Amino acid sequence: MSIIKEFKEFAVKGNVMDLAVGVIIGGAFSKIVDSVVKDLIMPVIGVLTGGLDFSNKFVLLGTIPPTFKGNPDSFKDLQAAGVAAFGYGSFITVAINFVILAFIIFLMVKFINKLRKPEEAAPAATPEDTVLLREIRDSLKQR
């Protein structure tokens, strides 16, 4: 079998196509979930926490050079200038966003699973003794 035929079988058989469709739909779905978190959930959390913003929380690890022209209280300005700073606030913001995002996806999957029709249970396998008795019966009929 040629390499092209093998690749063709690999690409069109099995889960490769399912995976490709899943990745494409996942990319589109992630934009929806990102929008839900950023545009709907985070503003509510901002109101509940009094507008608290963790993204600019940091610990200065180095010294600010005398040529620095940005805001010394801005993590982004310090990063842009190459000043060493431990930006724990950005991590906290990303972690909170992740937890919220994961919870929203969990709720969506749970809702979608409720909408799905339950699969019918596969019929139980015939017990081995019944199969043996049928074989004996069939062999006796043939005599």
Curated annotation (Swiss-Prot):
Keywords from the UniProt entry: Cell inner membrane, Cell membrane, Ion channel, Ion transport, Membrane, Transmembrane, Transmembrane helix, Transport
Give a Pfam family name: MscL
Is Cell inner membrane given among the entry's keywords? yes
Residues crossing the lipid bilayer are 10-30, 89-109
Which domain of life does this protein belong to? Bacteria
Which GO terms of the molecular function aspect are on file?
Answer: mechanosensitive monoatomic ion channel activity
Task: Kindly state the subunit structure of this protein.
Answer: Homopentamer.
**What family, per the record?**
Belongs to the MscL family.
Kindly provide the name given to this protein in its UniProt entry: Large-conductance mechanosensitive channel
Q: Which organism does this record belong to?
A: Burkholderia cenocepacia (strain ATCC BAA-245 / DSM 16553 / LMG 16656 / NCTC 13227 / J2315 / CF5610)
Lineage, highest ranks first: Bacteria, Pseudomonadati, Pseudomonadota, Betaproteobacteria, Burkholderiales
